[in-house]
């Protein structure tokens, strides 16, 4: 169920302050954040935000198609290593 429009987008205040500070300074350095739950807003377009995935910070370059999505959607937390190979099929 999507968030109500009357509530507006959720973004952590500490992240919003970092984004506004980088916008004023014209800084292109990645902004480190642990806030995976924050929504991407139009002010973030063109910025690189390093989102923590539990082990490291994954750099995410924000484009206009990402607006309205959460930061955590672009930083996968699980590593898929593939299913176990079938040894019978390899021998044939």
UniProtKB/Swiss-Prot annotation:
A Pfam entry, by short name: Ribosomal_S19
InterPro entries for this protein: Ribosomal_uS19, Ribosomal_uS19_bac-type, Ribosomal_uS19_CS, Ribosomal_uS19_SF
GO molecular function annotations of the record: rRNA binding; structural constituent of ribosome
Annotated Gene Ontology cellular component terms: cytoplasm; small ribosomal subunit
PROSITE patterns, alphabetized: RIBOSOMAL_S19
Assigned keywords, A-Z: Ribonucleoprotein, Ribosomal protein, RNA-binding, rRNA-binding
Top-level lineage group: Bacteria
Biological process terms in GO annotation: ribosomal small subunit assembly; translation
Protein family (similarity comment): Belongs to the universal ribosomal protein uS19 family.
Function summary: Protein S19 forms a complex with S13 that binds strongly to the 16S ribosomal RNA.
Protein's recorded name: Small ribosomal subunit protein uS19
Species of origin: Shewanella loihica (strain ATCC BAA-1088 / PV-4)
